[in-house]
Amino acid sequence: MDGILAAVPSAVCVSLRISCRNLDNAESIYHFPGKSLNRVSVLQTGNYVSRKGNSLLKNRHCGEISRVIVKSAASSVGNAEDYAEETATSVKFKRSVTLPGCSSPLSLLGTGFREKKFAIIGVKVYAAGYYVNESILSGLSAWTGRSADEIQRDSSLFVSIFQAQAEKSLQIVLVRDVDGKTFWDALDEAISPRIKSPSSEDTTALSTFRGIFQNRPLNKGSVILLTWINTSNMLVSVSSGGLPTNVDATIESGNVTSALFDVFFGDSPVSPTLKSSVANQLAMTLV
């Protein structure tokens, strides 16, 4: 409890003292004409009270205000530590999540957003958060001490992350209404050119992927999880709001899963802000 109280901003405490002091002042201001000695508290809503009763009521009320403010402030401090905000879209991502199909919790490594250009106007479509199993970081010691710029330009680091035999996931949160077919067409437009000679396995995987979004409205707040279980298998989960709890489909194609990873972390990522954020976090972590 002491730690929680210590975390309450001083401005809140000052505000609390001022609020209770104002109750004292209010007692000398709010009274009935001709009966200046019979003061009535501004807290009173219908019944007269004595000055003694009024004092007790005021003290109890101030105590209740104190408890509520402390509880609220402590809760806000705790909640703020549990989330990271993607500032361009104001979407908040949990720092640690347990996702469907994953064997252990994943940790947030970076956030960004996807912007689509219409003529010269950029329209934000979704925010994205990238999560990894923390065991992946132990395999990146070769990049210890590198700057964020060096990490971002080094494609071999991101290849190492993709090839690591541990789960990683991309959480996409729509910030505007999008038709499912439109979303898939944009994704397929980025994936297909990265697969030079699609095999029957690739074609089947792309068909499965497409089927998830056909005739499916993706309203603002919808969440899509793209979870790489390994280099050849990826889970896709969709919900209309909040983290999905079930797996909608499994994509079984190494070419498709690697192409999708390259869409976000290759040399020409669809969300430069996401890749930059991940690089910055890695630079701070790999020290």
UniProtKB/Swiss-Prot annotation:
InterPro entries: Chalcone_isomerase, Chalcone_isomerase_3-sand, Chalcone_isomerase_bundle_sf, Chalcone_isomerase_sf. Belongs to the chalcone isomerase family. Keywords: Acetylation, Chloroplast, Plastid, Transit peptide. SUPFAM superfamilies: Chalcone isomerase. The modification N-acetylalanine is found at A73. Hexadecanoate binds at R114, Y126. GO terms for cellular component: chloroplast; chloroplast stroma. The keyword Phosphoprotein does not apply. Pfam families: Chalcone. This is Fatty-acid-binding protein 3, chloroplastic. It is found in: Plastid, Chloroplast stroma.
